[in-house]
């Protein structure tokens, strides 16, 4: 057995397709195409030319392989010998093209079309362990002398002896060139960007009742036989199998007909996802901090001090013993000293934070001040992958603990080379993506950020850096989006499913999204200070600003994709699903500006028809989604552009009218009654005071989603990868 790359005769050593090497090459998965069992289709164009000199395309699967490689797969061929566990060890997907005796087809001329018993066992074991298998059958299947049916039968499918004809739904008026019809509301979206697929002299498939199978393509009601299965997807143990009733549709002379190529890529993606799906729920190994005595001693002391501290971080001697607080602080300082050698690169910060902690004690545990040490905490100056940083401050955690308690956290910087290269284009010197190594209770919450302004200081600290916990962002997104997918019966394209199952891919996606989003706050036509969190403005202004940055990032993915960026398509799914499924139902209903942004996006997509909510099932018109999101981005940008010539009050009103054009306001809203009911001649705060806590209630879709996913949302508290 050898592996050969397409358009090459060089033998590839097994070490060259090791998973770690593939990760560096950023390939989706490894596809192995069998060419050792007298296949009627050749991957090698030279072999195809020998098989059919007059029309090599009628014997070639070269374009089949090249399409997969262009999509991000590695494609190799198995050209000699038996299919064994060793032969399959470097593959994620095995493709078995139609095979035949020489009596019926011109073939590659290698091996027997009959799989040996040991091969059948090896292939089944490969699937059980999480492999993907594609079996390509044919019309009048039994006559070709292969035993693909024996293999397909192990997964509950049979390729029947038939030829489908359709005089109404066919290609080029040929009755045997039938157009398949897709089950649009299937578990997986094999019809993603497939308007039509043509099969050429197809057989039909039969499925046993016990198989965990889904028929995703059938013949039409006008065909003979009518509504017969043409494509079947099976989930078998940890693996996946697809059986097709035709092999011609992926040949070189047919793969570019209709949307046959896209169908092949959808199938390949779904099969490849078996491996990521099997690993989706695995937790990463615990970090060193989980068992480190020094860190655990620090956590113990911090948690013991937590109930002593007031909201501002001080400790009231009338309620709590300062002697006990002092003893606990000694334990904190001792633990910091013990941990210091592990963070030698932070020696200046650690020395300063010890002084700040001691000054807190000497000041009678009054309101703490960590300004001096915060100025020396600079993770932005050492953005290298896997660099760990230690921090201890009196601080609140955004979307977590609102009180300025003493908190300790150890972070690991996520800064792979590819991200460093991206930052050269999307420059953002303050951006520091991080992962959790260890944390105290303030981060056992929904908080996924670490910002300087959360720290207790005597004056506003310099904004040198902003930390984003990409592991938490990715993990909670995956959990909520998967639950929403199941609840809403949403069929997912293969790329979207891969994103939801792959933690590292999701982290990479969120980091690039965050990088572009964050810098967008200071770019564009800005009728106000975008960093307005401390200003008193209507909460829909915050909603529009956060939404603007996400919409702009979504649009930028089209630029990235044109440049060949592998993450662009995943970013679009992440922005769409996080905004639609998680944001609106996370947090309370008190002026929830992030939630409102998701409500606006849903309303626009529903209004334009890019999103449909019918029969309690959610569906997207994926081509329309992109255009609709870009349109919404342009509308928000126009609102901003025109706002430069408006007063602040006029912009608030214009923004309100924009939002209410999509999201219905509360029936009791004063703002909704019109400008004549607002105190426009008074102070602006009077206008803000009239805003209801839930000015824009959840619609019936989100009301249902909120009730049914409440436990899932709650379960993401404190989540890590």
Report the location of each language-model feature.
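Short, surface-exposed patches at the edges or C-terminal ends of soluble domains, predominantly
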Residues: 3-283
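Long, well-structured alpha-helical subdomains associated
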Residues: 507, 558-658, 672
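C-terminal, non-catalytic "cap/extension" segments appended to globular domains
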Residues: 627-721
């Amino acid at each position: 057995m050898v592996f050969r790359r397409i358009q090459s005769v060089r033998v590839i050593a097994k070490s060259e397709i090791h998973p770690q090497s593939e990760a560096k090459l950023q390939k989706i998965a490894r596809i192995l195409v069998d060419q050792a069992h007298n296949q009627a289709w050749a991957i090698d164009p030279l072999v195809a030319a020998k098989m059919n000199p007059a029309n090599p395309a009628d014997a070639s699967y070269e374009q089949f392989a090249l399409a997969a490689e262009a999509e991000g797969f590695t494609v190799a061929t198995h050209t000699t010998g038996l299919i064994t566990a060793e032969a399959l060890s470097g593959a994620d997907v095995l493709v078995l093209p139609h095979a035949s005796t020489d009596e019926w087809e011109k073939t590659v001329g290698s091996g027997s079309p009959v799989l040996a018993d040991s091969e059948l066992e090896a292939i089944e074991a490969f699937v059980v362990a999480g492999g993907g298998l594609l079996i390509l059958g044919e019309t009048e299947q039994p006559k070709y002398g292969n035993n693909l049916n024996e293999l397909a039968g192990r997964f509950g499918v049979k390729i029947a002896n038939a030829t489908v004809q359709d005089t109404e739904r066919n290609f080029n008026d040929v009755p045997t060139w039938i157009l398949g019809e897709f089950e649009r509301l299937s578990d997986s979206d094999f019809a993603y960007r497939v308007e039509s697929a043509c099969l050429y002299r197809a057989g039909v498939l039969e499925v046993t009742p016990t198989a965990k199978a889904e028929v995703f393509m059938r013949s039409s009601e006008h065909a003979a036989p009518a509504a017969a299965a043409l494509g079947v997807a099976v989930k078998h143990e940890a693996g996946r199998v697809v059986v097709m009733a035709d092999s011609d549709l992926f040949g070189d002379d047919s793969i570019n007909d209709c949307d046959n190529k896209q169908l092949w890529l959808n199938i390949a993606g779904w099969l490849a996802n078996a491996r990521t799906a099997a690993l989706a729920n695995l937790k990463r190994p615990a970090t060193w901090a989980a068992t480190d005595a020094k860190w655990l001693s620090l956590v113990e002391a911090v948690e013991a001090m937590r109930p002593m501290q007031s909201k501002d971080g001080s400790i009231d001697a009338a309620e709590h013993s300062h002697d006990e607080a002092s003893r606990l602080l000694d334990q904190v300082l001792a633990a910091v000293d013990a941990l210091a050698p592990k963070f030698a690169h932070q020696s200046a910060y650690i020395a300063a934070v010890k002084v700040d902690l001691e000054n807190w004690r000497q000041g009678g545990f009054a309101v703490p001040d960590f300004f001096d040490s915060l100025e020396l905490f600079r993770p932005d100056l050492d953005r290298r992958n896997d660099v760990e940083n230690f921090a201890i401050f009196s601080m609140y955690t955004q979307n977590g603990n609102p009180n300025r308690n003493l908190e300790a956290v150890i972070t690991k910087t996520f800064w792979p080379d590819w991200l460093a290269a991206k930052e050269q284009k999307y420059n953002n010197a303050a951006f520091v993506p991080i992962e959790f190594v260890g944390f105290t209770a303030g981060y056992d919450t929904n908080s996924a950020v670490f910002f300087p302004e959360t720290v207790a200081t005597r004056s506003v600290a310099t904004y040198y850096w902003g930390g984003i916990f990409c592991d938490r962002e990715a993990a909670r997104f995956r959990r909520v989006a998967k639950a929403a997918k199941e609840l809403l019966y949403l069929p997912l394209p293969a790329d979207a499913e891969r994103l939801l199952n792959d933690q590292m891919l999701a982290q990479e996606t969120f980091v690039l999204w965050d990088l572009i989003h964050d810098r967008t706050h200071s770019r564009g036509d800005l009728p106000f200070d975008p960093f307005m969190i401390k200003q008193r403005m209507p909460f829909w202004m915050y909603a529009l600003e956060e939404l603007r940055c996400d919409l702009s990032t979504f649009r930028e993915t089209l630029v990235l994709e044109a440049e060949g960026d592998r993450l662009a398509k995943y970013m679009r799914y992440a922005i769409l699903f996080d905004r639609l499924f998680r944001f609106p139902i996370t947090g309370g209903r008190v002026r929830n500006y992030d939630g409102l942004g998701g409500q606006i996006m849903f309303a626009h997509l529903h209004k334009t028809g890019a999103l449909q909510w019918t029969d309690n099932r959610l569906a997207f018109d994926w081509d329309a989604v992109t255009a609709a999101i870009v349109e919404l981005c342009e509308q928000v940008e126009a609102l901003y552009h025109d706002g430069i010539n408006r007063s602040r009050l006029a912009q608030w009103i214009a923004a309100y009218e924009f939002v209410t054009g999509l999201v219905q306001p509360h029936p009791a809203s004063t703002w909704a009654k019109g400008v004549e009911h607002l105190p426009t001649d008074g102070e602006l705060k009077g206008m803000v005071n009239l805003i209801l806590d839930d000015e824009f209630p959840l619609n019936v879709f989100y009301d249902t989603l909120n009730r049914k996913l409440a436990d899932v949302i709650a379960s993401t508290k404190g989540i890590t990868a």
